[in-house]
């Protein structure tokens, strides 16, 4: 079933104003501010901006760049590693750091903000690493995360965004055959993502766009990978099924530079 693209009356019917939200793995927030993030903050017009792989503590970042936005940070215990941040021009009702799991909350990977209509959860899913060395941990982490967002959903609908570190289907990467069983395209990781969908969450981009060649990450190990669009779709918006009537668009902004990933924008309401 395609998402509802008739936006003329949905916001009024739902009783809340439209919102623009964006997610971006910035691969180091301090470096990305000088490579395109600063301009994107000013130009995007987003109400909520979710960032992953910030690689910084809050006190290491000049917060004047975020004028007009309130911010919540979740930094890894290990300096210069992982980390997430949510910026919002819309006041939130509450926020939560992590998932409440001592085994999975040391790397700064999850932030939840509660708004009147829904939760927004940003996530930086662990990479399974070379030779799938961290795959068992990754799969356990996925299960804990799925249970966490399902608990939130008991109260109100949930939007999940971020770098989920998986290309779900062959259409989601340029070279599926040569990458079979590599980190991010193992059968186990793909099946785990399918369980998110089986739990009732929508892959919002694919609700609107079923075309190939739509990627959000390009390896820096191959200098011309982005120019040739040899990429992977690793960055997602997931939505509770109850939000389907409010989903208006989901856009991969591969024209925006500043990281090895690009932003993915969501319009809702």
Language model regions located:
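Structured beta-strand-rich core segments of catalytic domains in phosphoester-bond hydrolases
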Residues: 55, 60-128
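N-terminal, active-site-proximal structural segment of metallo-dependent hydrolase catalytic domains
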Residues: 2-65, 76-81, 97
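Active-site beta-strand/loop signature of hydrolases that rely on acidic residues for catalysis
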Residues: 25, 41-59, 120, 149-170, ...
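Surface polyanion/phosphate-binding segment centered on an Asp-His-Pro turn
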Residues: 251-269
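Metal-dependent phosphoesterases centered on the DNase I-like endonuclease/exonuclease/phosphatase
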Residues: 48, 68-70, 141-230, 234
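Surface-exposed cleft-lining segments at the edges of enzyme active sites
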Residues: 100-101, 126-142, 177-181
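Active-site-proximal beta-strand elements of phosphoester/diester hydrolases
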Residues: 19-27, 117-129, 161
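Conserved beta strand-loop-helix elements of the APE1-like EEP
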Residues: 79-94, 222-245
């Amino acid at each position: 079933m395609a998402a509802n693209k008739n936006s003329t009356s949905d916001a009024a019917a739902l009783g809340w104003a439209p919102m623009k939200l964006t997610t971006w793995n910035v691969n180091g927030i301090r470096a990305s501010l000088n490579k395109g993030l600063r301009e994107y903050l000013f130009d995007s017009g987003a109400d909520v901006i979710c960032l992953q792989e910030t690689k910084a503590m809050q006190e290491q970042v000049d917060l004047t760049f975020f004028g007009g936005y309130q911010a919540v940070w979740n930094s890894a215990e290990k300096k210069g590693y992982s980390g997430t941040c949510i910026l919002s021009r819309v006041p939130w009702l509450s926020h939560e750091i992590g998932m409440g799991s001592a085994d999975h909350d040391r790397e700064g990977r999850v932030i939840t903000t509660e708004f009147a209509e829904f939760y927004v959860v940003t996530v930086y899913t662990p990479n399974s690493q070379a030779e799938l060395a961290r795959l068992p941990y990754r799969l356990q982490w996925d299960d804990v995360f799925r249970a966490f967002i399902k608990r939130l959903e008991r109260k109100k609908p949930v939007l999940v965004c971020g770098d989920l570190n998986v290309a779900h289907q062959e259409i989601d990467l340029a070279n599926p055959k040569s990458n079979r069983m590599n980190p991010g395209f193992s059968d186990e990781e793909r099946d785990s993502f399918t369980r998110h969908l089986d739990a009732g969450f929508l892959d919002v981009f694919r609700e609107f766009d079923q075309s190939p060649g739509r990627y959000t990450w390009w390896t820096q190990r191959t200098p011309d990978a982005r120019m040739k669009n040899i990429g992977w779709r690793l960055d997602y918006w997931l939505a509770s099924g109850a939000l389907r009537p409010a989903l208006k668009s989901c856009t991969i902004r591969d024209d925006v530079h500043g990281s090895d990933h690009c932003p993915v924008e969501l319009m809702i309401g």
